[in-house]
Amino acid sequence: MDIRTGNGFDVHAFGPGDHVWLCGVRVPHHRGLIGHSDADVGMHALTDAIYGALAEGDIGVHFPPSDPQWKGAASRIFLEHAMGRIAARGYTLANCDVTLICERPKIGPVAPAMREALAEIMGIAADRISVKATTSEKLGFTGREEGIAAIATVALLQA
């Protein structure tokens, strides 16, 4: 049996705005996240974890930020592409785990909605998806509330 794991990491800085996109959910916040696409840091880390497990680079390889067609793009496009690559390579996604690192917004109240949104985008059961959060105890850029970071891990099984 061929089992593959992948890890992804992403960060985005805060900027002007009244919400952030996190794991496919629009979360009200007094600032937005700056990025070439919709800056969904959780979905970007998850997408990179999938590409990593497949040894197919990262989001930038598949969707170059220098290409204007991806300006403002919904991150679900990237995740759907990565899921398609899993199937094309003969794998299935066993499970995934996303950790959002921020002081605010608080993730706990919206984590179930994030799991459901990811399940819908990925076409898998929500019980195969974990979304959780932690803080950096007021240390570093996330502690100073300058942005949000995300870490994701996936496990793939040969179909």
From Swiss-Prot:
Pathway: Isoprenoid biosynthesis; isopentenyl diphosphate biosynthesis via DXP pathway; isopentenyl diphosphate from 1-deoxy-D-xylulose 5-phosphate: step 4/6. The lineage of its organism: Bacteria, Pseudomonadati, Pseudomonadota, Alphaproteobacteria, Rhodobacterales. Involved in the biosynthesis of isopentenyl diphosphate (IPP) and dimethylallyl diphosphate (DMAPP), two major building blocks of isoprenoid compounds. Catalyzes the conversion of 4-diphosphocytidyl-2-C-methyl-D-erythritol 2-phosphate (CDP-ME2P) to 2-C-methyl-D-erythritol 2,4-cyclodiphosphate (ME-CPP) with a corresponding release of cytidine 5-monophosphate (CMP). GO terms for biological process: isopentenyl diphosphate biosynthetic process, methylerythritol 4-phosphate pathway; terpenoid biosynthetic process. It catalyses: 4-CDP-2-C-methyl-D-erythritol 2-phosphate = 2-C-methyl-D-erythritol 2,4-cyclic diphosphate + CMP. This is 2-C-methyl-D-erythritol 2,4-cyclodiphosphate synthase. Pfam families: YgbB (PF02542). Binds 1 divalent metal cation per subunit. It comes from Cereibacter sphaeroides (strain ATCC 17023 / DSM 158 / JCM 6121 / CCUG 31486 / LMG 2827 / NBRC 12203 / NCIMB 8253 / ATH 2.4.1.).
